[in-house]
């Protein structure tokens, strides 16, 4: 639960992110989705209730301590260093870790290759396309090898082909053992990649289930998707 001035903007929301799964957190503006997401990431402390990660109560922990436990975060806002190269953006994180230079070099090479950034590895952040920037941001979030990554609007501001590439990257992350929570206004693209979705409305979970289940839910269509939403590909 989260209250502001006595008003509950989130009330009784319970979300489970299974190991190696992709979960979507969706809802209209003002529904409580963003507040819920920020309580999970540690930006907002709940008024009541718990945030539990791998059996540990992390409700009161700040973001940096959650990161140490294995929670990565991709901000909606640009977060790369504009005047550093792709490789140096990765090194900026790697150099905060107590690892050898050999490990830093091999980890940077691995991430650059994994996210298809080899051709732009020497380019400064300010010269990257929107899709390249987004891939670098995800690569940076993976530097510390988190077991859970929170993706805030990963499909925002990128072209359809890059969205498909990002969806593929996300699936590969899960195949490697990472769990993912996504919140994004691009409902269709999000539902294409998630295993399970939670629909938040008026601060509560309106519905949960597979993409096909939430799309076929008449209450969800009325409150969130609208009657014009097709969704035939999810049948």
Label every PLM stretch briefly.
Residues 91, 102-120, 168-171:
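Conserved ABC ATPase "signature" region
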Residues 26-28:
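The feature captures the beta-strand-to-loop junction immediately N-terminal to the Walker
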Residues 124-128, 132:
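Conserved ABC ATPase signature
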Residues 149-153:
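Catalytic Walker B motif of ABC-type/P-loop ATPase nucleotide-binding domains
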Residues 49-56, 69, 107:
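Conserved ABC transporter NBD signature motif
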Residues 145:
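Conserved catalytic motifs of ABC-family nucleotide-binding domains
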Residues 41:
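Helix-to-loop junction immediately C-terminal to a conserved catalytic motif
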């Amino acid at each position: 639960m989260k209250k502001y001035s006595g008003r509950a903007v989130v009330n009784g929301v319970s979300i489970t992110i299974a190991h190696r799964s992709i979960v979507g957190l969706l809802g209209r503006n003002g529904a409580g989705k963003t507040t819920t997401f920020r309580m999970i990431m540690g930006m907002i402390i709940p008024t009541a209730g718990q945030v539990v990660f791998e059996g540990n109560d992390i409700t009161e922990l700040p973001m940096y301590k959650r990161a140490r436990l294995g929670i990565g975060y991709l901000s909606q806002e640009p977060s790369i260093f504009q005047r550093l190269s792709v490789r140096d953006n990765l090194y900026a994180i790697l150099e905060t870790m107590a690892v050898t230079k050999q490990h830093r070099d091999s980890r940077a090479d691995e991430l650059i290759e994994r996210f298809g950034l080899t051709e732009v590895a020497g380019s400064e952040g300010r010269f990257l396309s929107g899709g390249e920037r987004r891939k670098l941001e995800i690569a940076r979030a993976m530097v510390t090898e988190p077991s859970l990554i929170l993706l805030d609007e990963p499909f925002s501001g990128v072209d359809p082909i890059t969205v498909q590439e990002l969806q593929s990257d996300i699936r590969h992350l899960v195949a490697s053992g990472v769990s993912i929570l996504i919140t994004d206004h691009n409902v269709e693209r999000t539902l294409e990649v998630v295993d399970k979705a939670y629909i938040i409305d008026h601060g509560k979970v309106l519905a949960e289930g597979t993409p096909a289940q939430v799309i076929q839910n008449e209450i969800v269509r009325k409150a969130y998707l609208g009657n014009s939403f097709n969704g035939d590909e999810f049948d």
